[in-house]
């Protein structure tokens, strides 16, 4: 019988001790004498958020189907336990075995958000693994990173031995085979990493050198050896239908942030929103066959006991077999009183019939993302959404019995003017007025409630807006104030609620998103000063970040306030995502002409993703 890593005394001291004990329903236990590879799958945030992440569930299931691999889960300890583990010298452990992960073969992290970078160091520190790759000796685990943040791995390059660029289903088997052979042949850590760098999609940062110009921009980046690639090619699982998927995912003991079954219906997006990194890095769009999804949904319901199923996709409305899938789900879910969640709906593709069936009893609020307050700016960002689309979709919703609508917008987008900012509350006011004009008083479900939320735009790598500048926190807050003041001037202001994102976090996120390798030292400084859980408002300290960056001889404005010239070499230019830089430049220029590029089903825009040989590129 396994022994818990934490004593009862410690568990009674900390918040939500169930975060740390493992043994949840559908978790996997194995005999360590029967496996060759022990793999720690880490999420650098709290348990409840990490347990909501589909990517970890997919890889956990895939690895544990391999007879000689045991994959365990690790989440960032909450600050209360962090302090105890440091004081009592308790090494970070895997949930399943409760054994220290410093003794595992691999420690991997999925990186979803730049503000979790200090938690990378927290995990390594608590695990008693050297923070920097160069300080790890032959007995240390191989430390790997994957996920969307690895599309610019440079600000965290010092902390990882390997970055896995792309979708995890494709190359881990080859990496494991290489590792077993390297162990059998007695290869050193350095020799193994050299061989790993030859596997397509794997980037070993220690084997690449970066040279800088006098102005701080990158001059060049080159491999140290001739037998490793100059460009790292993103990995894509072209056939999603026949790839691995967890039909019996781990069910947490405590409520997770997304406490539901997740059914991935497609990957990628046919839309080309110019601010959206996910829409670019997950190209080409690939759909799963509906009959397969029906089988998976039935298995999830049987194996989990959750009372809600969510369809995972960047744009659910664009899944071609959505009607058939929803009809099937309604049939099997109604009897079991299971709710169906449809995130990522486009207001122009809004299906009242589907939504009325899904929410035929309880009319929860509907959420849409126009992103910009005027048609001009929506054209700039390639949202492909008109005022008529928004008003017609809202009218259908009101006629269907809804009275609560949430709209998401961004402030600080390229070319934004005060007119665009003022357009946000004006649009909300028009939608509220439409409710009172459309729904007779006796049929109203209550007062109309329009919630508008604004985040501040952060330029991300591999988007057409990767050249854009950012602003000081005071400028962002000034833009939010313009929106807030104009809300108060609207005729239907009592029906409008406005909230906005934290401006100071936005600036640091922007620095990390487009940063270079020189920022590694700054991240270490932030952690050494007590910074971690920076994604959480109560633990974030803007001055600590800015001071640490400056102490490393770097100028924060260099990373945020500049609009980049088109010929600048980016820290991430050594990665090949299929979508070409020429396409990005064309889209950047098209944005400034306020011109819309059609979606992938309407017309191929020759972005380059067709090179992967599948998906929407080959539908016609």
Task: List the predicted regions and their residue ranges.
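Glycine-rich beta-alpha loop elements in corrinoid/cobalamin-binding modules
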Residues: 77-223, 464-516, 523-538
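N-terminal pre-triad scaffold of radical SAM enzymes
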Residues: 39-45, 63, 249-277, 301, ...
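Conserved SAM/AdoMet-binding glycine-rich loop
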Residues: 41-42, 46, 115, 295-451, ...
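Short secondary-structure boundary/capping segments
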Residues: 56, 88, 124, 158-163, ...
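A short beta-strand-loop structural module common to alpha/beta enzyme folds
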Residues: 67-80
């Amino acid at each position: 019988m396994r022994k818990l890593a934490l004593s009862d005394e410690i568990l009674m001291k900390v918040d939500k001790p169930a975060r740390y004990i493992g043994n949840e329903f559908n978790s996997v236990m194995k005999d360590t004498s029967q496996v060759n590879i022990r793999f720690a799958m880490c999420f650098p945030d709290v348990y409840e958020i990490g347990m909501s992440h589909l990517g970890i569930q997919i890889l956990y299931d895939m690895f544990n189907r391999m007879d000689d691999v045991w994959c365990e889960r690790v989440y960032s300890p909450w600050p209360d336990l962090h302090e105890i583990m440091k004081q009592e010298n308790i090494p970070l452990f895997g949930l399943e075995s409760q054994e220290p992960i410093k003794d595992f073969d691999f420690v991997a992290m999925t990186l979803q958000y730049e503000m979790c970078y200090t938690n990378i160091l927290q995990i390594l520190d608590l695990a008693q693994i050297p923070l920097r790759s160069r300080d790890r000796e032959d007995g240390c685990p191989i430390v790997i990173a994957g996920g969307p943040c690895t599309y610019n791995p440079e600000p965290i390059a010092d902390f990882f031995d390997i970055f896995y660029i792309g979708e995890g289903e494709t190359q881990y088997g080859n990496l494991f085979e290489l590792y077993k052979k390297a162990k059998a042949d007695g290869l050193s850590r350095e020799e193994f990493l050299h061989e790993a760098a030859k596997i397509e999609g794997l980037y070993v940062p220690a084997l690449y050198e970066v040279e800088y110009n006098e102005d701080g921009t990158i001059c060049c980046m080159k491999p140290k050896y001739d037998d490793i690639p100059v460009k790292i090619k993103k990995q894509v699982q072209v056939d999603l239908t026949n790839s691995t998927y967890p039909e019996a995912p781990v069910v947490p003991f405590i409520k997770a942030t997304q406490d539901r079954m997740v059914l991935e219906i497609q990957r990628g997006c046919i839309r080309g929103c110019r601010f959206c990194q996910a829409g670019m890095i997950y190209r080409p769009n690939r759909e799963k066959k509906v009959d397969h999804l029906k089988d998976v949904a039935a298995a999830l319901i049987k194996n989990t006991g959750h009372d809600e199923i969510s369809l995972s996709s960047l744009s659910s409305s664009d899944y071609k077999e959505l009607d058939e899938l929803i009809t099937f789900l309604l049939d099997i879910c109604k009897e079991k009183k299971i709710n169906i969640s449809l995130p990522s709906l486009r207001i122009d593709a809004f299906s009242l019939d589907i939504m009325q069936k899904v929410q035929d009893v309880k009319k929860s609020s509907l959420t849409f993302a126009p992103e910009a307050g005027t048609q001009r700016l929506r054209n700039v960002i390639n949202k492909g959404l008109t005022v008529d689309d928004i008003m017609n979709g809202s009218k259908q919703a009101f006629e269907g019995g809804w009275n609560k609508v949430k709209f998401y917008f961004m402030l600080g987008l390229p070319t934004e003017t005060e007119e665009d900012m003022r357009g946000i509350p004006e649009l909300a006011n028009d939608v509220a007025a439409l409710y009172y004009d459309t729904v007779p008083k006796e049929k109203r479900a209550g007062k109309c409630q329009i919630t508008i939320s604004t985040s501040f735009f952060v330029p991300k790598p591999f988007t057409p807006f990767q050249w854009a500048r950012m602003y000081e926190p005071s400028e962002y807050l000034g833009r939010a104030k313009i929106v807030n003041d104009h809300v108060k001037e609207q005729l239907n202001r009592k029906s409008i609620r406005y909230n906005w994102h934290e401006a100071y976090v936005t600036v640091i996120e922007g620095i990390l998103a487009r940063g270079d390798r020189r920022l590694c030292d700054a991240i270490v400084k932030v952690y050494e000063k007590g910074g971690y859980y920076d994604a959480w408002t109560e633990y974030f300290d803007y001055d600590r970040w800015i001071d640490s960056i400056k102490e490393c001889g770097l100028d924060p404005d260099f990373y945020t306030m500049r609009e980049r010239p088109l010929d600048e070499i980016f820290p991430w230019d050594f990665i090949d995502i299929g979508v070409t830089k020429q396409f990005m430049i064309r889209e950047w220029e098209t944005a400034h002409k306020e011109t819309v590029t059609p979606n992938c089903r309407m017309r191929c825009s020759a972005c380059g993703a067709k090179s992967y040989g599948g998906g929407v590129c080959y539908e016609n």
